[in-house]
Amino acid sequence: MWTISGIYFSFNKIEDVRGSQYLRTTEVIETPKGNKIEPQKALLNVADKTFLKPISVVEITEDKAGSEYRGRSLPLYMIETINEENEGINVYLDPFSEEIVAIRSNQWRIWDFMWGIHIMDWNERDNIGNVFLKIFSILALLSALSGIYLFFSSNKKK
């Protein structure tokens, strides 16, 4: 699985996974500090700043382990949208700065799942120093070194 997830990463551009292709080039206009925009304004912002069609908005105030918005400051607005192919895409908007902080599509969800497998952290998908990864990394190195040794030692006998 480690190799399969690594292959997956090498064939998918991180920019596409992060949803850059859905953003329009626009000016950044911030609201006065401390003023939180209304949910309806969040829908309009996403319509203006992306090529996506906003459907609904939910305010997120609690952090959840392994969430699509992990590592972001809360609160956030999660705007549920669809693209031209009617695929559901979540856009996360900072309600104070009106900045889009994350775009999460099915492509991102697959990437995130593969990342969790690749680093062997299935819950948070943030810990690249866990025991499983260290053990399997050492085993992979030993396997590679023994393969190189066997390759060269078998050629000498011929």
Where are these regions (language model features)?
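Conserved histidines in hydrophobic membrane contexts and catalytic metal-binding motifs
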Residues: 1-158
